[in-house]
């Protein structure tokens, strides 16, 4: 923890540099570090981390590495908790919309893997530890969001002292941002993942450029649960050129094929 701001994490707590070199041992080591920082059941870890892979990489190799990292985290999860990890969604989109602190829906225990490709579009990212804030206020994470919605100014103010800026984020590199997206209640008897909210402020949006995000949602489930994203769909995620651009906020945009 950063002593200057009580609940803000230092860069060394969440910033990691790595390479995609095919070495299994390095992948195992990276997965262990990432798992420990993201898949927390208390407040001794950030609940998020950023892995910078540099700029000398292809998009397909990047996406393939994301899936390899997720599979290695799956092995860890089985060994430690006798539970499984499954992919709930896999998508690629052009994200150039500023957001407020939010979670992306999904099961009570899940995390996001957001794979950012190099782009001229700059962004500032913030992580807000709403689970810890809720715990300090005697609330569950769900109750906290109902009573102090951070989409509004009053709720946003409460989170100020629980917010960390992702200072190592670089728009010129391939990066994987892993975010504990959970909303589970804290328990020492039956530990469950404790989530954080994320915020993106787009500095210089420009529709003629792209800010490609490769997004995976990963859930913690009992072993034997069927995975919604098939092997074929995972392969398509790696090899597709499709980038979703249209949405509720920009319905007129056409997707890149």
Model-derived segments and their meaning:
Residues 1-79, 237-257:
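N-terminal auxiliary "cap/dimerization" subdomain that precedes the catalytic jelly-roll/cupin core
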Residues 40-43, 100-107, 166-171, 206-210:
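A general structural signal for short secondary-structure junctions and capping/turn motifs
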Residues 128-135, 140-142, 151:
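C-terminal folded domains that constitute the principal catalytic or ligand-binding module
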Residues 154-257:
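Catalytic core of Fe(II)/2-oxoglutarate
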Residues 49-52, 112-114, 124-125, 176-179:
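A structural signal for short, well-ordered beta-strand segments and their strand-loop junctions
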Residues 126-134, 232-238:
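Short intrinsically disordered coil segments
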Residues 75-128, 148-150, 156-165, 199-202, ...:
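Conserved double-stranded beta-helix
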Residues 55-58, 118-121, 182-185:
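Short, solvent-exposed loop/turn segments at secondary-structure junctions
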